[in-house]
UniProtKB/Swiss-Prot annotation:
Region feature (Carboxyphosphate synthetic domain): 1-401
Organism: Lachnoclostridium phytofermentans (strain ATCC 700394 / DSM 18823 / ISDg)
Region (Oligomerization domain): 402-547
The protein's role, per its UniProt record: Large subunit of the glutamine-dependent carbamoyl phosphate synthetase (CPSase). CPSase catalyzes the formation of carbamoyl phosphate from the ammonia moiety of glutamine, carbonate, and phosphate donated by ATP, constituting the first step of 2 biosynthetic pathways, one leading to arginine and/or urea and the other to pyrimidine nucleotides.
Sequence ranges assigned to domain MGS-like in this UniProt record: 932-1066
NCBIfam families xrefs: CPSaseII_lrg (TIGR01369), PRK05294.1 (NF003671), PRK12815.1 (NF009455)
Binding, ATP 2: 709, 748, 750, 754, 779-782, 822, 834
Domain notes: The large subunit is composed of 2 ATP-grasp domains that are involved in binding the 2 ATP molecules needed for carbamoyl phosphate synthesis. The N-terminal ATP-grasp domain (referred to as the carboxyphosphate synthetic component) catalyzes the ATP-dependent phosphorylation of hydrogencarbonate to carboxyphosphate and the subsequent nucleophilic attack by ammonia to form a carbamate intermediate.
Protein name (database record): Carbamoyl phosphate synthase large chain
Catalytic activity: hydrogencarbonate + L-glutamine + 2 ATP + H2O = carbamoyl phosphate + L-glutamate + 2 ADP + phosphate + 2 H(+)
EC number: 6.3.4.16, 6.3.5.5
Cofactor note: Binds 4 Mg(2+) or Mn(2+) ions per subunit.
InterPro entries reported in the protein's UniProt record: ATP-grasp, ATP_grasp_subdomain_1, CarbamoylP_synth_lsu, CarbamoylP_synth_lsu_oligo, CarbamoylP_synth_lsu_oligo_sf, CbamoylP_synth_lsu-like_ATP-bd, CbamoylP_synth_lsu_CPSase_dom, MGS-like_dom
Residues bound to Mg(2+) 4: 834, 836
Length: 1066
């Protein structure tokens, strides 16, 4: 079937801000699909509220709306742009849910707009738990015994009939939101209440728990003519019971017999045909070990996290092909871009093994429960490729950037064999390392399998790795032993650790005496049956090299930013991709190194060459030895890339742009203080310390409050405000849980207004696209603050000082490329608090809203061009004639036990944008995009720390004027009443009813404003109240500045008045 020529203008719905369960994979899929549609001459209209994405760049779609992802806003866009079709399958659950609301309300029919890529019936059959169950029964596909419920008592009745444990799966939710495994009635009531609240249709599936069965996934494609293929099948190392996004996943499956593989493949093709899917689809199965019994767990009728993994694992561009199918093409009409010779109807074949390991945020949320269940907790993931499973696992583990280089991780020296046996029962992020320790202690693979239900094949492979550790410790390091260890991807540093040699000795022995070098193989979709046209490589130690490293033009190495995590998100991938594109245009051969399967940077056609490798010195050196690049770019890949600077210089690779010494000078307290003194720039007083005692002395000399933080970190990791000696002791203990190579900084904390700039510098001139102002006062991490462009409340004098200081600092640090500076404005004085001579998380946002492509300009500066010649002027750019507000988005509901109080350590996972002609409308849009929906009941809770009580009076007065009923803790209520604001006093957690907890559990409250005292004590009432508000779905604000901003937007804007701005036309 050729293309459907009636499709001329398509609205693509994006996935919105990054939250746990919905990360960069949808930017990758959406970008690929928009490019695929434009290739076919289709006009593409895009709506997505996330400014950090590549897909919201003005040249990816024809019209780009960075607007809140709500049904009402999408309706407005359809009425304005009049697309003939809507493609909702590339924006994850958010896009599917909006499409269903527009279809069910009759809006799409009224406007003559068609859904393409899927139908509402297809979405319903896959997403509605009752429809799905009925469809599976109709075609004879087995599901676990289950019932669909819309009330908690119905769930309890079913569970008591079939017995606990049971699994709760809400309909139309993402990343297992609201789901879980309940071991008893109390847990069931808790999980099911939450699940029904989060489900778009108030529906949950309660099913018999089959935890312990193998979890298998099939990624399938089907076209409109009914042709189907399986792109990839994947096996979760973790059995059923852990969300697939939190599981270690292996592709292709390793433990299935051919009969099992074919049985599930046939089932997947039957299901996709019955549900009538056109495009990509993911089917998840539970397979009972040692039998042919299986159950269908669920079907995702859209591009998903698993499709991104399958795409990168096989080289098959699922999103691109899905977009072509949506236009009417059949699989045999779509060429395979990797081989250039085959078509999309050829099933990929793999002659290597791929391992994905999730990246969890437990280093940021040390109080959060680490237990893994059916509700996802990972923020990102890493992928590795090798010719064997052991090698792929070892590569994936070191890609996580947690100082883990082998299976020998974690201190178990104080644990007895019995303790280790107990730890095997814990299902958390450390389980594979506990398995390795259990093997070392002589616990049999059979017993480990019995406890964990992880397949013996995987346990045996981990045993092979622990056996190699033993051999390296006990045997002489012969060439044969070294080669065997390298084939399992043991890094030189681990071989050195076990063999008692130094790293340099091992490296010299391997490279010079034994001549053992990494070889690179191609990912080609067809197990080398046809030659690949696109250069996409992975390393191994047991084969011929397949890379053509001949030099035709200058080569530049672009280092990516690794897995998505809090503090280092999709923004840095955005910067890496734009730097790569810019350098390619400047005539360089570009080489990307990265290991994140969700991102645009690891797509096969972004750079001239892609190396899917861990970002460690040894792995990068293997590439450098082969490619001999003329230079490397580290300033676009976040802290991951910056940390490789020293290693690259040792390899003889020049760092393009700002030199390593100047990056160090910005991080080194003493060197940086000298620069500030020379430039006559003030900063808050501070000291460097190494021990807790030194920190307490420094804090007392500076005077409380102080800021305590490690140096060389991203996202404010480990940063806290201390108000007394006990706080300093607690924070130092937490910081020192990780070995600190650098001193710890103690700074005087100033309660001023925080202002931020990103600038481009060529060594002489600077260009500042705009000045951004934070709504929250200093002390809340810039990534968690609401950011406003252009700054609204700074004077011209302060603005001039900021530009002057930026120019002086950029010149003193000899910045070539990007620099990010954070200032505090306190009593009209400007202080510098932080300087980062690299890209920052605000770069995509400021680029889009000012229409100044600063990554591209910085890349040109890095290559020697002058800013004055690039057509955007120098100094501070002219202000835009609209306001853009970047709003942080959090994923607290997925992390039970995490404190949501904001402070200097970053906690947000994503962001959205509000853009409008007026400040009030932009602010309202930003809150709307972040999912802060108010009001339903017009009832709120106000409880603030003593220091905030007087300021809380005006907040209470404004809420009262909006018609809110205020409940307040006794001390807060007393201050409000004394100042003429009526409030109902209530107890916090204990005491006479109704307490604050009772009010929250009664689902009558719209909003909680609770400003926390310092510290991480989980037993404090404030902590309990903040957690309960998140778990009952109530918006909770922990800063009065945020509360005032919300009030401003509520006082000034009604929903019907929202305007739309196409940023491609700015």
């Amino acid at each position: 079937m050729p293309k459907n020529n009636n499709i001329k203008k398509v609205l693509v719905i994006g996935s919105g801000p990054i939250v746990i369960g919905q990360a960069a994979e949808f930017d990758y899929a959406g970008t690929q699909a928009c490019r695929s549609l434009k290739e076919e001459g289709v006009t593409v209209v895009l709506v997505n509220s996330n400014p950090a994405t590549i897909m919201t760049d003005k040249d990816i779609a024809d019209m780009v709306y960075i607007e809140p992802l709500t049904p009402d806003v999408v309706k407005k866009i359809i009425l304005k742009e009049k697309p003939d079709s809507v493609l909702p399958t590339l924006g994850g659950q958010a896009a599917l849910n909006i499409a269903m609301e527009l279809e069910e309300s009759g809006f799409l029919a009224e406007t003559g707009t068609k859904l393409i890529g899927t139908t509402s019936l297809t979405i319903k059959k896959a997403e509605d738990r009752l429809e799905f169950k009925n469809t599976m029964e109709k075609i004879g596909e087995p599901c676990a015994a289950s019932v669909v419920v819309t009330t908690v008592p119905a769930a309890v009745d079913f569970a008591e009939t079939i017995g606990y444990p049971v699994v709760i799966r809400p309909a139309y939710t993402l990343g297992g939101s609201g789901g879980g495994i309940a071991a008893d009635k109390e847990e069931l009531i808790d999980i099911c209440t939450n699940g029904l609240r989060l489900s778009r249709v108030g529906q949950c599936l309660i099913e018999r728990c089959i935890a312990g069965w193998k979890e298998i996934e099939y990624e399938v494609m089907r076209d409109g003519a009914g042709n189907c293929i399986t792109v990839c099948n994947m096996e979760n190392l973790d059995p059923v019971g852990v969300h697939t996004g939190d599981s270690i996943v292996v592709a292709p499956s390793q433990t299935l017999s051919d009969k099992e593989y074919q049985m599930l493949r046939t089932s997947a093709l039957n299901i996709i045909t019955e549900i009538n899917i056109t495009g990509g689809c993911n089917v998840q199965y539970a397979l009972k070990p040692d039998s042919f019994e299986y159950c269908v767990i669920e079907v995702n009728p859209r591009v998903s996290r698993s499709s991104a993994l399958a795409s990168k694992a096989t080289g098959y561009p699922i999103a691109k092909v899905a977009a072509k199918i949506a236009l009417g093409y059949t699989l045999d009409e779509i060429p395979n871009a990797i081989t250039g010779k085959t078509v999309a109807s050829f099933e990929p074949a793999l002659d290597y093994c791929v391992v994905k390991i999730p990246k969890w945020p437990f280093d940021k949320f040390i109080m959060a429960k680490r237990t893994l269940t059916t509700q996802m907790k990972a923020t990102g993931e890493v992928m590795s490729i090798c010719t064997n499973f052991e090698g792929a696992l070892m590569k994936a583990v070191r890609s996580l950037e947690q100082n883990i280089y082998s299976m020998n991780y974690g201190d178990y020296s104080k644990d007895s064999v019995e303790d280790i046996r107990e730890k095997l029962h814990l299902i958390d992020d450390r389980r594979i390392f506990v398995i390795a320790e259990a093997i070392r202690r002589g616990i049999t693979p059979e017993e480990i399998n019995d406890i964990t239900k992880i397949d013996l094949w995987f346990i045996d492979k981990i045993a092979i790795l622990t056996e190699m550790e033993k051999r390296l410790s006990e045997e002489p390091l012969t060439k044969e032993l070294m080669l065997e260890a390298k084939r399992m991807e043991f890094p030189d540093r681990v071989i050195a650790q076990f063999s008692g040699k130094t790293l340099e000795e091992v490296k010299k022995l391997r490279k010079e005496e034994y001549e053992i070098h990494a070889a690179f193989k191609t990912v080609d979709t067809c197990a080398a049956e046809f030659e690949a046209q696109t250069p996409y490589y992975y390393s191994c130690f047991d084969s011929e090299n397949e890379v053509d490293a001949t030099k035709t033009k200058k080569k530049v190495l672009v280092l990516g930013s690794g897995p998505i995590r809090i503090g280092q998100g999709i923004e840095f991938d955005y910067c890496s991709v734009h730097a790569t594109w810019s350098m390619s245009k400047s005539g360089f051969e570009t080489i990307i190194v990265n290991n994140n399967p969700e991102t645009v940077s690891t797509d096969f056609d972004i750079a001239d060459k892609l190396y899917f490798e861990p970002l460690t010195p040894e792995d990068v050196e293997n590439i450098v030895d082969l490619e001999q690049p003329d230079g490397a770019v580290v300033q676009f890949g976040g802290q991951t890339a910056i940390k490789l600077t020293e290693a690259l210089l040792k390899m003889g690779v020049p760092i393009l742009g700002t030199s390593a010494e100047n990056v160090d000078a910005a991080e080194d307290r003493e060197l940086f203080d000298e620069i500030l003194e020379k430039c006559c720039i003030p900063r808050p007083a501070g000291k460097t310390v190494f021990t807790t005692e030194e920190a307490i002395v420094a804090a007392n000399q500076l005077g409380y409050p102080v800021l305590v933080r490690p140096s060389y970190v991203l996202g404010g990791a480990g940063m806290q405000i201390a108000i007394c000696d006990d706080d300093v002791r607690e924070f130092m203990e937490i910081i020192n849980r990780n070995v600190q190579e650098h001193p710890i900084l103690v700074d005087k904390y100033l309660m001023g207004k925080e202002v931020e700039v990103d600038a481009v510098c060529d060594g002489e001139d600077i260009l500042i696209p705009g000045i951004m102002e934070h709504i929250e006062r200093a002390g809340i991490h810039s990534g968690d603050s609401i950011s406003v462009y252009p700054a609204q409340s700074i004077s011209n004098k302060v603005q001039d000082v900021i530009v002057d200081y930026t120019r002086k600092l950029a010149k003193s640090l000899n910045v070539i490329g990007l620099i990010n500076i954070q200032f505090i404005v306190y009593n009209e004085e400007v202080y510098v608090i932080e300087v980062n001579p690299r890209s920052s998380r605000t770069v995509p946002y400021i680029s889009k809203v000012t229409n100044i492509p600063i990554v591209s300009l910085a890349s040109k500066a890095v290559l020697g061009e002058k800013i004055a010649d690039l057509g955007y002027g120098t100094g501070l750019a002219k202000k835009a004639d609209y306001i853009a507000i970047k709003m942080p988005v959090f994923s607290f509901e997925k992390l039970r036990g995490a404190d949501i109080g904001l402070g200097p350590e970053m906690k947000s996972t994503g962001e959205c944008l509000g853009i409008a002609k007026t400040f009030n409308e932009a602010l309202y849009k930003a809150f709307l995009g972040a999912g802060i929906n108010l009001p339903k009941h017009k009832k709120m809770i106000l409880t603030v720390k003593d220091a905030d009580k007087l300021e809380a009076v005006s907040v209470g007065r404004r809420f009262k004027a909006l018609g809110y009923e205020i409940y307040a803790t006794r001390s807060t209520a007393r201050v409000l009443k004394e100042n003429g604001v009526d409030a109902i006093p209530v107890q916090k957690v204990d005491g006479e009813s109704p307490t604050i907890l009772d009010l929250l559990l009664g689902h009558e409250i719209d909003l909680v404003v609770d400003t926390p005292t310092q510290g991480r004590d989980k037993s404090r009432d404030g902590f309990v109240i903040r957690r309960m508000s998140i778990e009952t779905g109530v918006t909770c604000l922990t800063s009065l500045d945020t509360a005032n901003a919300l009030l401003t937007s509520l006082e000034n804007v009604a929903d019907g008045e929202l305007s739309l701005i196409d940023i491609a036309r700015i």
